């Protein structure tokens, strides 16, 4: 099989490519140049997609004896990931740029070009698995290593995309074994630290980065009843569940800290309240997609049992869900967790599971507060 190995410059993609070579595939390595911004290209940057990463990817391919290329996807990355990130914050939502990058760059733009060039599959270092289901159709599953599992950020993949995905690290029980294997193979990235930051905000200062791109203006901080408590420097720079950065001179009546409950960009307001008001008992999702064949209940709109994860490496909770159209007729999901969840924000991604299988995903549109709402209907 002709395989295009996406080489990030990290240890996972290097070992994944090595295993693809061992499996007898005709492997070609490619590194994606995603940004020309100085903050992400300087030597020693903490984000990914740096000049150092490109050099490490080249050295890994040289060690493996496979061809190496660099593809410039910076323009599409800027439009589909960076601009989208800014637009979501402007709308008062909390986006996941890694999810968007997988959806529109790594498994859309990259895969499309790979197929055009005659490749059969794209190989990455993601910790996830593609397995046949009972009917023979392909399904996305969690990896053997729960601590490193990345099936959440791959929940955007479709059945057609899964047919061209190769995840050689799927059954590896720990990251330590991947590093040990890299060292045995003589790969220079064996001890390279993982990247944890948003790649285009390597210093981690999301608020400062947004302030340079969004027209932030001071506005009121209010409680759920609308009483003004203080002033913020820009509503769009806040996210649900945030506590830091709230300039509130007046303490809460119970003396407990306040958290962001809601961001209202059109009114330029930030609504705050006690921690207990972050509890959510019903979620609606928009722009849903299925990672493989939909569950049978999707055709009828009936409730189905599942498990829910709403942030990368976050907890997975039992839930029920159903597919429903909104008032405009657009498809969506309604999700009810078995217990209230804390800190769910519009813009995050809700990924549904059944056992180890990823059923699919949707972007969270609304999250209903459990303490301020009426009981759910059946």
Swiss-Prot record:
It is an enzyme of class 2 (transferase). One of its GO terms (cellular component) is cytoplasm. Keywords: ATP-binding, Cytoplasm, Disulfide bond, Nucleotide-binding, RNA-binding, Transferase, tRNA processing, tRNA-binding. It catalyses: S-sulfanyl-L-cysteinyl-[protein] + uridine(34) in tRNA + AH2 + ATP = 2-thiouridine(34) in tRNA + L-cysteinyl-[protein] + A + AMP + diphosphate + H(+). The keyword rRNA-binding does not apply. It is found in: Cytoplasm. Residues 148-150 are annotated as: Interaction with tRNA. Its main location: cytoplasm. The active site is at residues 101, 199. Disulfide bonds join 101-199. Pfam families: tRNA_Me_trans, tRNA_Me_trans_C, tRNA_Me_trans_M. GO terms for biological process: tRNA wobble position uridine thiolation. The record marks 126, 348 as: Interaction with tRNA. One of its GO terms (molecular function) is ATP binding. NCBIfam families: PRK00143.1 (NF001138), trmU (TIGR00420). HAMAP family: tRNA_thiouridyl_MnmA. Belongs to the MnmA/TRMU family. Catalyzes the 2-thiolation of uridine at the wobble position (U34) of tRNA, leading to the formation of s(2)U34. This is tRNA-specific 2-thiouridylase MnmA.
